[in-house]
Amino acid sequence: VIGMICAGTLAALGAQIGLKGPITSHPSVKDQLDALYEYKDSPVVVSDNFVTSRGPGTTFLFALTLVEKLVGLEKRNEISGPMMLV
């Protein structure tokens, strides 16, 4: 599983990870990714084992998505329930 958040998604571009696939990032770097990716304005974007997220405000959703990818939906639900995320 590869996870990138905020402007860190520029590393995907440099490493040519997931080219032409869906991706998200901090809006400040969107223009740098737009031509080579299917850019989404979603808080978290999952493409196979590549997970990207927008920034500090999306970190809980990003982390829970990584938990789900690594150990399953049941564990994600177990963790997220007590957190009372909206």
Predicted regions and their residues:
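Active-site-adjacent pocket-lining segments in enzyme domains
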Residues: 1-86
